[in-house]
């Protein structure tokens, strides 16, 4: 991967997260603490973040310091999420499908642990980890902002609009 593409990938991922956070915080939310609110799955606004994965903001502002947030990640079967880390703790609950998670600086299929619907994993800030969506998967991510994805090796990130390899 050349430096131009690397720069594009990093900028695209950061931009998508910022757009999703900003878009959600600008919407009038009935879950702002003054009243309860229901968000229907069909009403979620999904934004592609990497090839095979989309992100939707449910609650809070993931870019704001110390602010609680809830996001959903939807991935197609076979999608690899390269090794990365976050500056804050990350809590993940599998809602649908089979999701596999591994810890370390580099994707290693032998170290993946399988999670099924209802399973939960909590990763402390700065823990390097990676994932594989074994089947079509939806996971819910919650924590305190600012939530940011820092790729261990950005050249492994496949942009959402990348064409299949020939």
Regions found by a protein language model. Give the residues of each.
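Bacterial N-terminal signal peptides that target proteins for export
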Residues: 1-11
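Bacterial N-terminal signal peptides
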Residues: 9-19
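Short acidic-glycine-tyrosine-enriched beta hairpin
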Residues: 105-126
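A short, N-terminal "cap"/entry segment at the start of jelly-roll beta-barrel domains
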Residues: 24-67, 156-166
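Short beta-strand His + acidic residue motifs that chelate non-heme Fe in jelly-roll/DSBH
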Residues: 81-83, 101-102, 123-124, 128-134
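Glycine- and acidic-residue-biased ligand/ion/polar-headgroup-sensing regions
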Residues: 76-79, 86-106
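Double-stranded beta-helix
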Residues: 34-37, 110, 130-166
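Conserved short histidine dyad/triad with adjacent acidic residue
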Residues: 69-86, 114-115, 124-125
């Amino acid at each position: 991967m050349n430096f131009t593409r690397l720069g594009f990938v990093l900028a695209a991922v950061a931009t998508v997260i910022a757009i999703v956070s900003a878009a959600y915080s600008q919407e009038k939310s009935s879950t702002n603490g003054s009243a309860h609110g229901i968000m229907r799955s069909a009403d979620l606004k999904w934004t592609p973040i990497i090839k095979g994965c989309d992100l939707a903001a449910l609650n809070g502002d993931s870019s704001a310091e110390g602010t609680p947030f809830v996001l959903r990640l939807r991935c197609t079967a076979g999608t690899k999420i390269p090794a990365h880390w976050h500056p804050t703790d990350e809590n993940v609950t599998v809602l649908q499908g089979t999701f596999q998670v591994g810890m370390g600086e580099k994707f290693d299929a032998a170290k993946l642990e399988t999670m099924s619907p209802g399973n939960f994993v909590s990763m402390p800030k700065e823990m390097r980890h990676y994932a594989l969506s074994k089947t079509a998967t939806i996971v819910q991510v919650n924590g305190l902002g600012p939530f940011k994805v820092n790729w261990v090796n950005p050249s492994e990130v496949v942009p959402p609009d990348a064409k299949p390899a020939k």
